[in-house]
């Protein structure tokens, strides 16, 4: 959640940045009106309170005590009424603020959508073939690794069953990713896949993205769309010791998304599924640590791809493509020869204090004052998409898949 004081004191500047992130101008106009009303009603409340303080002190020496008592009693009622007005405005402001995204960093390019993201660099050269490479779903069906028909039968569309060496390769990737991330200093944690509404709110999924979440009927429980949600909220409502920061964690989980806005996109294969697996990086830092930890996380995910021999590129997301909670995001896109293009396989984001304010995660700074932490998250990596990348990049003309050397010990 945004700092409402900063929003009020620097409204025009912040509003301009939020417009770049596609915040509705009517919402910004409503906020401006609420801030003006709140200022007016607070001023009136302060005047009533000042009257009460001044004349309460004079009551003992007043000549007409009964008259003054009556005035003070009447003024107290006005204070109660005015306090209710102020509280109602503050609650309305906070409710609107819950649905307003984070402010983009200064380094984030202004743009409308993914077409205006900025390529930062390419890592490794794409694979070359002396034959036309197949897409992963063709390979998966011919090798009996991917069973889409039975996945749909037991669930619905956008579900798949992994079988035989495909399932083994997926398991090997999970173990390798966890080991790789741990070697970079990230502590492995295992968390529930079902979390409560407060946890969903803390990282920004609720209330804005409620329609894309799977909820358990009659219970305050949601299936997670990423392990960023439970891992970040492990420290919700806590005040951390300065010397414990940064906290760097990695976690494997299944992820569940309705993909409400993805009709017609990636309908074949396992690129976009309602259930998929991911190994995540999550960090909690002091404000002055978050930029360097962001670079560590990005390097970890990129080096992991390189260790698998997968060509990829770094993209800085523009304001129009930036996620709700993120102040800055760099995507990693892996080369898929079957599709003849790069596809997203990781997003690394710095959320600054946006999630920490919602989840109430603080630390005691060097001056002994409680200060909001910064939170960061990133995929290292999306398991299914890494499986896709290996299948397409390591195929031969007979349709067989060769296993990267670093994974062989996991079979």
UniProtKB/Swiss-Prot annotation:
Keywords: Aminoacyl-tRNA synthetase, ATP-binding, Cytoplasm, Ligase, Nucleotide-binding, Protein biosynthesis
Reactions the enzyme catalyzes: tRNA(Ser) + L-serine + ATP = L-seryl-tRNA(Ser) + AMP + diphosphate + H(+); tRNA(Sec) + L-serine + ATP = L-seryl-tRNA(Sec) + AMP + diphosphate + H(+)
GO cellular component: cytoplasm
Major subcellular location class: cytoplasm
Residue numbers binding ATP: 257-259, 344-347
Source organism, top-level taxon: Bacteria
PANTHER family: SERINE--TRNA LIGASE, SERYL-TRNA SYNTHETASE
Function: Catalyzes the attachment of serine to tRNA(Ser). Is also able to aminoacylate tRNA(Sec) with serine, to form the misacylated tRNA L-seryl-tRNA(Sec), which will be further converted into selenocysteinyl-tRNA(Sec).
Alphabetized NCBIfam families for the sequence: serS
Subunit description: Homodimer. The tRNA molecule binds across the dimer.
Protein name, per record: Serine--tRNA ligase
UniProt source species: Campylobacter jejuni subsp. jejuni serotype O:23/36 (strain 81-176)
């Amino acid at each position: 959640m945004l700092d409402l004081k900063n929003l009020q004191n620097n409204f025009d500047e912040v509003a301009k940045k939020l417009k770049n992130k596609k915040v509705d101008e009517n919402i910004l106009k409503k906020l401006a009106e609420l801030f003006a009303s709140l200022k007016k009603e607070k001023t009136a409340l302060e005047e009533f309170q000042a009257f009460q303080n001044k004349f309460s002190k004079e009551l003992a020496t007043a000549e007409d005590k009964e008259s003054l008592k009556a005035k003070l009693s009447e003024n107290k009622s006005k204070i109660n009424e005015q306090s209710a007005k102020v509280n109602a405005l503050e609650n309305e402001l906070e409710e609107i603020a819950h649905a307003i995204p984070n402010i983009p960093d200064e380094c984030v390019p202004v743009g409308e959508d993914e077409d205006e993201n900025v390529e930062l660099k390419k890592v490794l050269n794409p694979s070359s073939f002396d034959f036309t490479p197949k897409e992963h779903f063709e390979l998966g069906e011919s090798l009996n690794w991917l069973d889409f028909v039975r996945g749909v039968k037991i669930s619905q569309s956008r579900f798949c069953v992994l079988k035989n060496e495909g399932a083994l390769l997926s398991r090997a990737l999970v173990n390798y990713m966890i080991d790789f991330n741990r070697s970079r200093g990230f502590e492995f944690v295992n968390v529930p896949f079902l979390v409560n509404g407060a946890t969903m709110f803390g990282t920004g999924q609720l209330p804005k993205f409620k329609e894309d979440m799977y909820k358990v009927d009659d219970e305050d429980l949601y299936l997670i769309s990423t392990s960023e949600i439970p891992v970040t909220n492990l420290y919700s409502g806590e005040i951390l010791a300065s010397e414990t920061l940064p906290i760097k964690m990695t976690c494997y989980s299944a992820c569940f998304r309705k993909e409400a806005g993805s009709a017609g996109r990636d309908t074949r294969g396992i690129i976009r599924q309602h259930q998929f697996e991911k190994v995540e990086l999550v960090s909690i830092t002091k404000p002055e640590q978050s930029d360097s930890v962001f670079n560590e996380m990005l390097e970890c995910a990129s080096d992991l791809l390189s260790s698998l021999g997968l060509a990829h590129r770094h993209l800085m997301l523009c304001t129009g493509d930036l996620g709700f909670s993120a102040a800055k995001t760099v995507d990693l896109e892996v080369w898929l020869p079957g599709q003849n293009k790069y596809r997203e396989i990781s997003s690394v984001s710095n959320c600054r204090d946006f999630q920490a304010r919602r989840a109430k995660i603080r630390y005691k700074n060097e001056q002994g004052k409680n200060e909001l932490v910064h939170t960061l998250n990133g995929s290292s990596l999306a398991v299914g998409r890494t499986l896709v990348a290996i299948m397409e990049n390591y195929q031969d003309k007979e349709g067989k898949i060769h296993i990267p050397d670093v994974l062989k010990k996991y079979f």
